[in-house]
Amino acid sequence: MSKFFRRRKFCKFTAEGIKEIDYKDLNTLRQYLTENGRIVPSRVTGTKSKYQRQLTTAVKLARFLALIPYTDNHDI
């Protein structure tokens, strides 16, 4: 028997009934970014491939419009 209980992954967007991911919803987008600004893969988050593609497009659009930084804040 395993020592640790692994939580089952589920798609948050399917569970909440979200049809499309909006690039202006920054709080949702930030949940799927690492502290360095990289997009977290679906094998880690459990999102379905349909929503992972929408998420990627929304993050890239938000980055282009300067709503989200491309990387973390570097101290130079």
UniProtKB/Swiss-Prot annotation:
Q: Which InterPro entries match?
A: Ribosomal_bS18, Ribosomal_bS18_CS, Ribosomal_bS18_sf
What top-level branch of life does the organism fall under? Bacteria
Q: Which UniProt keywords apply?
A: Ribonucleoprotein, Ribosomal protein, RNA-binding, rRNA-binding
Specify one Pfam family: Ribosomal_S18
GO biological process entries: translation
Question: What GO cellular component entries does it have?
Answer: cytosolic small ribosomal subunit
Any one Gene Ontology MF annotation carried by this entry is: structural constituent of ribosome
What family is this?
Belongs to the bacterial ribosomal protein bS18 family.
Identify the PANTHER family for this entry: 30S RIBOSOMAL PROTEIN S18, SMALL RIBOSOMAL SUBUNIT PROTEIN BS18M
The record's HAMAP family line, in alphabetical order, gives:
Ribosomal_bS18
| Record's function text | Binds as a heterodimer with protein bS6 to the central domain of the 16S rRNA, where it helps stabilize the platform of the 30S subunit.
Q: How does it assemble?
A: Part of the 30S ribosomal subunit. Forms a tight heterodimer with protein bS6.
Name of the featured protein: Small ribosomal subunit protein bS18
Q: Which organism is it from?
A: Xylella fastidiosa (strain Temecula1 / ATCC 700964)
